Amino acid sequence: MKKVSVLGSTGSVGKKTVDLLSKRKEEYQVEALSAHSNFALLAHQAKLLNAKYVAISDERLYKDLKESLLGTDVKIAIGATNVAAIPVDLSVVAIVGIAGLGPVMEVIESGTKVIALANKESIVCGGKLLLKKAKEKNVQIIPIDSEHNAIFQILQNDDKCVEKIILTASGGPFLNYSLEQLRNIMVDQALSHPTWNMGKKISVDSATMMNKALEIIEAHNLFNISPDKIEAVVHPESIVHGIVTYKDGFNFAVLAETDMAIPISYALSWPERLVLNYKLDLTKQGKLTFQEPDHKHFPVLKLSMEVLNSSTPQTNSIVLNAANEIAVNEFLKSRIGFLEIVEVVESTMESFGSYTDINSLSDIINIDCESRIIAHKIVESKVVAYS
């Protein structure tokens, strides 16, 4: 029986993971679960999966969680890092944002040998530091993002003579919108993705295509591939998740339905495969289309390449991610407009001036904090100007 932990179990990916695990209790023993604030769902999941440990990040909800688990033997902690330190066979990390970086590092140190990673920000910001530590500890990182999961599967079979990798993007809900239409986007519109069912933050990132920008940086770090060998194409049907082009002209692609249960199950069962009832019928799909991204409407893809080709790519990656997290949060509060998300990111990167060597987790956190302060000031200036 495989021992598993799920960090971020109440988010969209976490809930999918819990659902899969609940149907295979004879194969998986869930040691630990963690959540940010949804104590009621966390308690329900703990009972459902007979988890031994749970952690809540918002310490104000500790008593509520404790009351919800009265009569059980579940041990309760505050903060995901406390349960991340529990060694398991496989840890699923589905925490949103850079908040997942510390727990990922803790999992690597714990003795856990496989990490199923849905937290792209830890790879984007942790970069070489995180991956070096994983290599030292002999930890296998399996990406859950469907695009990187696809590339991972292909490269598992053949990682030599790679010409380029292609990450597909749905284009989000505003693919064919004019700039004037984009200027007037409301929050509920940005949360309505045409092909994927996702959380709020990643839905907005998909709408701005920042999700793909972060994935380009993630692919560079995760697969150690030069930026000039990474390409993004718009594929509205979202059936082809990733393509690897080899030097002899052959292209290998991974195709699957648009359900996160598929890459999650791959990560849970690796190096084996689970039996799932997701059968792709291309005759019913009808057509698969691809097109170049519109960089005028969605400038963040070029921004990610500028980051990777800069003299300080890791620092700039951290700044990019931090500013985006602040901007998306302010957009979700309706304090800034849709197009202003990218404006805040660009202005933050232009204003950031502290470049230091990154040798520790604290170095990353310091850059992240400074970037957030700058981004907040830029947001406030826009709010004042708007009002």
From Swiss-Prot:
Gene3D superfamilies: 1.10.1740.10, NAD(P)-binding Rossmann-like Domain. Its EC number is 1.1.1.267. It is an enzyme of class 1 (oxidoreductase). Pathway: Isoprenoid biosynthesis; isopentenyl diphosphate biosynthesis via DXP pathway; isopentenyl diphosphate from 1-deoxy-D-xylulose 5-phosphate: step 1/6. NADPH binds at T10, G11, S12, V13, N38, N119, E121, G199. Mn(2+) binds at D145, E147, E215. 1-deoxy-D-xylulose 5-phosphate binds at K120, S146, E147, S170, H193, S206, N211, K212, E215. InterPro entries: DXP_reductoisomerase, DXP_reductoisomerase_C, DXP_reductoisomerase_N, DXPR_C, DXPR_C_sf, NAD(P)-bd_dom_sf. The keyword Secreted does not apply. Its cofactor is Mg(2+); Mn(2+). One of its GO terms (molecular function) is manganese ion binding. It catalyses: 2-C-methyl-D-erythritol 4-phosphate + NADP(+) = 1-deoxy-D-xylulose 5-phosphate + NADPH + H(+). It comes from the Bacteria. Pfam families: DXP_redisom_C, DXP_reductoisom, DXPR_C. Keywords: Isoprene biosynthesis, Manganese, Metal-binding, NADP, Oxidoreductase. Catalyzes the NADPH-dependent rearrangement and reduction of 1-deoxy-D-xylulose-5-phosphate (DXP) to 2-C-methyl-D-erythritol 4-phosphate (MEP). Belongs to the DXR family. This is 1-deoxy-D-xylulose 5-phosphate reductoisomerase. It comes from Wolbachia sp. subsp. Drosophila simulans (strain wRi).
